[in-house]
Curated annotation (Swiss-Prot):
Catalysed reaction equations from the record: (2R)-3-phosphoglycerate + ATP = (2R)-3-phospho-glyceroyl phosphate + ADP
The keyword Transferase is assigned to this record: yes
Pfam family, one: PGK
Family: Belongs to the phosphoglycerate kinase family.
Keyword hit for Kinase: yes
Organism, as annotated: Rippkaea orientalis (strain PCC 8801 / RF-1)
Domain of life where this protein originates: Bacteria
Gene behind the chain: pgk
Name this protein carries in UniProt: Phosphoglycerate kinase
Subunit structure: Monomer.
GO biological process: gluconeogenesis; glycolytic process
Keywords, sorted A to Z: ATP-binding, Cytoplasm, Glycolysis, Kinase, Nucleotide-binding, Transferase
Length: 400
């Protein structure tokens, strides 16, 4: 499934045209100050490309969860200010995303100018994918570009609805890169392919583990979910997090890995804590020596060595989810070691894909984000794509 992208649009296709671009400007704010503008910068290649080709660029995004009401603190004005600084040109801030005032503002745009529509989620119809709202949103544009991978797994008016009223409908550079890396890793990986799955719960990663067991050569499991696997093996896990209703599933996943010939690696030692706190007392033990009253919050140093050895010959790696409670420095060593290992492997030619969510925060915290082949910008969207699901926002785009 190859989707049309902005690369397929010539200057003649877009010059003088009104191009509606769905971006993800859901950035963290402290008052009116943007504390991290990564998502704004990530959209710049698509925006600049359209400016250079002489389009009238109309950007739309959600911000926070205003639940269909106008919430003053969730207006996109600070985003327009920052975007204007990054582009080095003015950005017209609209007072709504549909209606006469928006139409008037867009009609004033010259070729190569940019307007930002107000928060889409001030209208409940956005998340409901209301056709009438989608039609109003599309009425001010000629064609559509989706560059918001983080919301591609949702069928909203701005991600799916508008495509029924505009043509062509294409992917921006960000979505194109996501599809190139994530789909290639699943459908046609360079082998050996190793998947590293972490996080606290097996339940949230069942789909991705099951899909990757069909695709990968080795599967490394870390994070809180390891204790469900240990308990399923009959080991004592103390006060560690366990999903008792997933013990049979854990057994079946291990059995499936064996049946498929996939190396299934669980930690051999863990770092225990006497309570869930950054200053808890800690000790490292073998997995068969976990005592009552203690909980595992990280993988141990022996496990790190075993995992590093398993990763040494890999050509592709997908990492989703931390190895421990990396927010606490005392229990971040496992996650940090894996991040550094992947950074080194990238330097040797391995394709390293950080599949969204907490693993992205982890590689950023360690300072090796720029050393990975690809960092996915979507949390839920990355997981669903890795699970092999169809994402509505991608399915709605034109085929090549």
């Amino acid at each position: 499934m190859t989707k049309k992208s902005i690369v397929n649009l010539s200057p003649a296709d877009v010059a003088g045209k009104r191009v509606l671009v769905r971006v993800d400007f859901n950035v963290p704010l402290d008052g009116a100050t943007i504390t991290d503008d990564t998502r704004i910068r990530a959209a710049l290649p698509t925006i600049k490309d359209l400016i250079e080709k002489g389009a009238k660029v109309i950007l739309c995004s959600h911000f926070g969860r205003p639940k269909g009401q106008v919430v003053e603190s969730m207006r996109l004005t600070p985003v327009a200010t920052r975007l204007s600084e990054l582009l080095g040109q003015p950005v017209v801030m609209c007072d709504d995303c549909i209606g006469d005032s928006v139409t008037a503002a867009i009609n004033q745009l010259q070729n190569g100018q940019v307007a930002l529509l107000e928060n889409l989620r001030f209208h409940a119809e956005e998340e409901a994918n209301d056709p009438e709202f989608a039609q109003k949103l599309a009425a001010n544009a000629d064609l559509y570009v989706n560059d918001a991978f983080g919301t591609a797994h949702r069928a909203h008016a701005s991600t799916e609805g508008v495509t029924h009223y505009l043509s062509p409908n294409v992917a921006g550079y960000l979505i194109e890169k996501e599809l190139n890396y994530l789909q290639a890793a699943i459908e046609n990986p360079q082998r050996p392919l190793v998947a590293i799955i972490g996080g606290s719960k097996v339940s949230s990663k069942i789909g991705v583990i099951e899909t990757l067991l069909e695709k990968c050569d080795k599967l490394i499991i870390g994070g809180g979910m390891i204790f469900t696997f240990y308990k399923a093996r009959g080991l004592n896990v103390g006060k560690s997090l366990v999903e008792d209703d997933k013990l049979e599933l854990a057994k079946s996943l291990e059995a499936k890995a064996k049946e498929k010939g996939v190396d299934f690696l669980l930690p051999t030692d863990v770092v225990l804590a006497d309570n869930f706190a950054p200053d808890a007392n800690a000790k490292t033990v073998s997995i068969d020596a976990i005592e009552d009253g203690w909980m595992g919050l990280d993988i141990g140093p022996e496990s790190v060595k075993v995992f590093q050895a398993a990763l040494a010959d890999c050509k592709s790696v997908i990492w989703n989810g931390p190895m421990g409670v990396f927010e606490f420095d005392k229990f971040a060593k496992g996650t940090e070691a894996i991040a550094h290992t992947l950074a080194e492997l990238t330097g040797k030619g391995t394709i390293t894909i950080i599949g969204g969510g907490d693993s992205v925060a982890a590689v950023e915290k360690v300072g090796v984000a720029d050393k990975m082949s690809h960092i996915s910008t979507g949390g839920g969207a990355s997981l669903e794509l890795l699970e092999g699901k169809v994402l509505p926002g991608i399915a709605a785009l034109d085929e090549v």
